[in-house]
Each structure stands twice: as structure tokens, then as C-alpha cells.
């Protein structure tokens, strides 16, 4: 697993956007050979999305032949609800780029048969040959998507009950009212994410420091689902300095030394 440490959230966002854009450019997607991209919601990727929008508007990258799969969606709120992940993605990314609507895939939290919705999502991902690059963020407790502590590290797309910690953390998007936060969601599983050819995780802020420590320095543990990345052959965590405060000095120095030549990844 690689760890790229950048000074600020802005630097992290730029690095992540450049990495995604470079992967798409290198693949040279076409209509018959699309690039399959997994995407997150939440506060962590917003800066990356802003940078990708600028790269798209400047003509450096196109999303016309990119097919996206989002990680998760709340159960029981309408797609046009301002805090649904459908709304989030259109507001912060999709409406600003040249992606085709038919190439966007987001779980339907209002499907009549939620279990079937999850099964069909898995089948659709597999029908495209799997996800080439899955971008994600993590919660303070180390969860990826809505794979809360205790989730199976081989789990697939499914219905998940949210922990009180996650509900409290997400209440900032619901006027600070925990009672307005949905109590369950549909989410891709850890196994779904781990099947991706490459995983890129964005980590920023002091409140993610303990999760990053468990991801990098501790053992694999289903109570810290981010730790599953240790088993992936091509996983990258890009972190700001604030999130590294619980790492050992030697760990930080080690990764800074071996990744120094990769700090500047501006598009060529």
C-alpha cells in the first residue's frame, strides 16, 4: 500500500484529481472500451471533484466514455432530496462535466426490492469487467462507504444499518438534527471495493488520524474496515498532514522518502 502525504487538503484534492485524470487518459477510453470509475460522496472528495471539473472544462480530460458507479445511497429519501447522494453527485460533479447520463450508476434507496437492487448492482459492475479505479474516503472510525465497524471484509453490495457515530457525523448535512438522518443505506461491500483494479482513498483532517493509523500501522481488523486495503495489490492513500498526527515519525519519514518523486503529478 502506498501513502502520499501532502501539506493541505487543497494539495490532496489536486493530487487525487490529477491521478484520476491521468488514469483515464492513459486508458484512452472509447464507447466500446469505457473506463469504469467508482466514486464517493461526503466532504472528502469535494475538492477533487472541483479540480476534475476544471480539468474537464480546460479540455485536459473527457468523461464522455467513462462509466461511473457510486459507493452508496441512503434508504428512504427521494432521489431529489437535497441530501441524497444522487443530488450530491449532480450538484458537485455530474452537472458540470461532459459525462453521459446513461453512464451514471447510483444505487436506488427507494427500490421496491432492495436486496434485488443490490444484486443487480453487483451484476452490472461485473458486466463491465469490474471497476478499474475506485475512489473513496473514510470516516473517523475507518469505515469505507457505509461498511461500518464489524463489516465482513468479503462483503458485497447490501443493506446496512448505520452506527450512531455515522449518524451523528452525517447530521451536519441534515441541519445538525440526528433525527433527520436516515438510519440505513445501500452500500457496496468491502469485497466489492477490493475487487477493483486500483483503490484511491482520500484522508484529511485531525479527526481521521486514528483511522489512518489503523490503516497503515495496525493489523487487518474488521472493526477498522479501512485496514482491508493492506491486502490489495494496488491501493493508494493520499492524506493531508493533519491526518498523519497519530502515525509514528518513522512511518511518515519512510513514506515521504519513497514517494517524494511522486508528489508532483500534474498532467503531462
UniProtKB/Swiss-Prot annotation:
Record's family? Belongs to the glucosamine/galactosamine-6-phosphate isomerase family. NagB subfamily.
Please report the organism this UniProt entry assigns to the protein: Borreliella afzelii (strain PKo) (Borrelia afzelii)
Under the heading PROSITE patterns, the entry gives:
GLC_GALNAC_ISOMERASE
Q: In which pathway does it act?
A: Amino-sugar metabolism; N-acetylneuraminate degradation; D-fructose 6-phosphate from N-acetylneuraminate: step 5/5
**Which keywords does the record carry?**
Allosteric enzyme, Carbohydrate metabolism, Hydrolase
Documented EC number(s): 3.5.99.6
Q: Which GO terms describe its molecular function?
A: glucosamine-6-phosphate deaminase activity; identical protein binding
InterPro entries (UniProt xref):
Glc/Gal-6P_isomerase (IPR006148), Glucosamine6P_isomerase (IPR004547), Glucosamine6P_isomerase_CS (IPR018321), NagB/RpiA_transferase-like (IPR037171)
Protein name (database record): Glucosamine-6-phosphate deaminase
Give yes or no: UniProt keyword Hydrolase: yes
Q: Which GO terms describe its cellular component?
A: cytoplasm
Which residues of this protein are catalytic?
A: 72, 141, 143, 148
Q: Which reaction does it catalyse?
A: alpha-D-glucosamine 6-phosphate + H2O = beta-D-fructose 6-phosphate + NH4(+)
UniProt keyword DNA repair, yes or no? no
Instruction: Name a single GO biological process.
Output: N-acetylglucosamine catabolic process
What exactly does this protein do? Catalyzes the reversible isomerization-deamination of glucosamine 6-phosphate (GlcN6P) to form fructose 6-phosphate (Fru6P) and ammonium ion.
Amino acid at each position: 500500500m502506498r501513502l502520499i502525504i501532502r501539506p493541505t487538503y487543497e494539495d490532496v484534492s489536486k493530487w487525487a484529481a490529477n491521478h484520476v485524470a491521468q488514469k483515464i487518459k492513459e486508458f484512452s477510453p472509447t464507447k466500446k472500451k469505457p473506463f469504469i470509475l467508482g466514486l464517493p460522496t461526503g466532504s472528502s472528495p469535494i475538492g477533487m471533484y472541483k479540480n476534475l471539473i476544471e480539468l474537464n472544462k480546460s479540455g485536459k480530460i473527457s468523461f464522455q466514455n467513462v462509466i461511473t458507479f457510486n459507493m452508496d445511497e441512503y434508504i428512504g429519501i427521494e432521489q431529489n432530496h437535497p441530501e441524497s447522494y444522487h443530488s450530491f453527485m449532480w450538484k458537485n460533479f455530474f452537472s458540470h462535466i461532459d459525462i453521459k447520463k446513461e453512464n451514471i450508476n447510483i444505487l436506488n434507496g427507494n427500490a421496491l426490492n432492495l436486496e434485488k437492487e443490490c444484486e443487480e448492482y453487483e451484476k452490472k459492475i461485473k458486466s463491465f469487467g469490474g471497476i478499474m479505479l475506485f475512489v473513496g474516503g473514510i470516516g473517523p472510525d475507518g469505515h469505507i462507504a457505509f461498511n461500518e465497524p464489524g463489516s465482513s471484509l468479503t462483503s458485497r453490495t447490501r443493506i446496512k444499518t448505520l452506527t450512531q457515530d455515522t449518524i451523528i457525523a452525517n447530521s451536519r448535512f441534515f441541519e445538525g438534527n440526528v433525527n433527520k438522518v436516515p438510519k440505513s443505506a445501500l452500500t457496496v461491500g468491502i469485497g466489492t471495493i477490493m475487487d477493483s483494479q486500483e483503490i484511491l482513498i482520500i484522508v484529511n483532517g485531525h479527526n481521521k488520524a486514528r483511522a489512518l493509523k489503523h490503516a497503515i500501522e495496525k493489523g487487518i481488523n474488521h472493526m477498522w474496515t479501512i485496514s482491508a486495503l493492506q491486502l490489495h495489490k494496488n491501493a493508494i492513500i493520499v492524506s493531508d498532514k493533519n491526518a498523519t498526527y497519530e502515525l509514528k515519525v518513522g512511518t511518515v519519514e519512510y513514506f515521504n522518502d519513497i514517494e517524494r518523486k511522486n508528489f508532483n503529478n500534474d498532467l503531462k
